[in-house]
């Protein structure tokens, strides 16, 4: 029983790891921030919660954008200012 609790705790802690500041963080269910070169990639990687600069991939409340490599991004921040 304790082993299950410890494994579950590590899994929950690991969900918040992997964020980056270089514009290419890991995908998350609700805070998906992935480099999206085009609409097709956005749809596949962000489950239609995406935004690409080609103008074909726009949804409200999206967290996935085509951003410059030097754009600083933080968890939960929209990089479209």
From Swiss-Prot:
Which InterPro entries does the UniProt record give?
Answer: LCN-type_CS_alpha_beta_dom, Scorpion_toxin-like_sf, Scorpion_toxinL/defensin
Q: Which positions carry the signal peptide feature in this UniProt record?
A: 1-20
Under SUPFAM superfamilies, the record lists: Scorpion toxin-like
Q: Keywords assigned by UniProt? A: Disulfide bond, Ion channel impairing toxin, Neurotoxin, Secreted, Signal, Toxin, Voltage-gated sodium channel impairing toxin
Q: Which residues form the LCN-type CS-alpha/beta domain?
A: 21-81
Q: Which GO terms describe its molecular function?
A: sodium channel inhibitor activity; toxin activity
Q: Which Pfam families match?
A: Toxin_3
Instruction: State any GO CC term.
Output: extracellular region
- List locations, semicolon-separated: Secreted
What does the record say about tissue specificity? Answer: Expressed by the venom gland.
Disulfide bond positions: 32-80, 36-57, 42-62, 46-64
Its function, per the record, reads:
Alpha toxins bind voltage-independently at site-3 of sodium channels (Nav) and inhibit the inactivation of the activated channels, thereby blocking neuronal transmission. This toxin binds, in vitro, to sodium channels and inhibits the inactivation of the activated channels. Seems not toxic to mice, crickets and sweet-water shrimps.
About its domains, the entry says:
Has the structural arrangement of an alpha-helix connected to antiparallel beta-sheets by disulfide bonds (CS-alpha/beta).
Which family does the record assign? Belongs to the long (4 C-C) scorpion toxin superfamily. Sodium channel inhibitor family. Beta subfamily.
Protein known as: Toxin TdNa10
């Amino acid at each position: 029983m304790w082993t299950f609790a410890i494994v579950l705790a590590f899994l929950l802690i690991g969900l918040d790891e992997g964020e980056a500041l270089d514009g290419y963080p890991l995908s998350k269910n609700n805070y998906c921030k992935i480099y999206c070169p085009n609409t097709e990639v956005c749809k596949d990687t962000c489950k239609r919660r995406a935004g690409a600069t080609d103008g074909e991939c726009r949804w409200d409340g999206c967290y996935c954008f085509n951003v410059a490599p030097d754009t600083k991004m933080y968890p939960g921040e929209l990089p479209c200012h």
